[in-house]
Amino acid sequence: MGLTVHQLKAKAAEWLLLKVKYPLEYRLSCQRLPELSHQKKIILTLLPGHDNLGDHAIAYASYCFLKKHFPAYDIIEVDMKEIYRLARPLKRSRHPEDIVCIIGGGNMGDLYRYEEWTRQFIIKTFKSYPMIQLPATVHFTETKRGKREERRAIHTYKQHPRLLLMARDQTTYEWMKLHFPDQDVWKQPDMVLSLDESSKDETREGVLLCLREDQEAYLTKEERQQLQQHIQETYDQVGLITTTIGIRVDRTTRLEELTALWTELKQAQVVVTDRLHGMIFCAITHTPCVVLRSFDHKVMEGFEWVAHLPFMTLLKEPNEAAVKEAVHQLMKTSSQKGEEAG
């Protein structure tokens, strides 16, 4: 299936940004940050500037983790757009103990070119720094473009002499071990699982649906509509939420938006989701959750990290009957989930 005119224009605009505008900003940047040169720092970068709260939760959790475990370091947050303009000033202000951390997530691959090409820019630009790729999922499509982008990524990652790679699922871990036998590769959970946003004070009612409508969805549009209708016919109180909220979010507004979403989850008896961070948000808020698979391995393998929680149920082949039964079972035990999670 060919691309529409709108899609072609969007891809052309993205290419111009990544290949012309942003590299020019990098080369022309003359800003100086002398105040940073006297303090060792962790440059936390590839932060999102879009509306996906899952990615913002990763950035927030990464910041909190680094702040807690590396108190002697200043944590400097730099988003995907800023890094092109600030890379040279940051390098000019380098302290001998500086470290670069790239936030994790599901954008390692060819589905999200902006993020992947910016990751490669960071790896090449900060080649002399110790660098950590925080827990990520890789997915390169089985297409000519996907294979080409995979070769390019492998070549770029291999050129960094001190790059620690972290995988948040087994498939990614095996991919990294295969292609980078001489580099350190760790398997670690998604950074958001380091948070605890649980509360025993909330009154829980009804069911919330949090389902994908993008290129990562496993369910078709018709299947989603049928599932929604089925749940609404079975339960009196059914709501719809999403982790992509339709407004741009940055590091100054992310906690407010995340807190609002987490509060909404904590007021539900059961959540049905096919989103990885829908599942993870339920885990950290101790919200009973029926997890449906996504189009790739991300959700099913991500479930490994929360499978021990008694209020989480995974459906590998979701259908109406299976979802209904799973929701029913969790409804019966939702009042005890706080004590069980304990």
Where are these regions (language model features)?
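Active-site anion-handling motifs in enzyme catalytic cores
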Residues: M1-G342
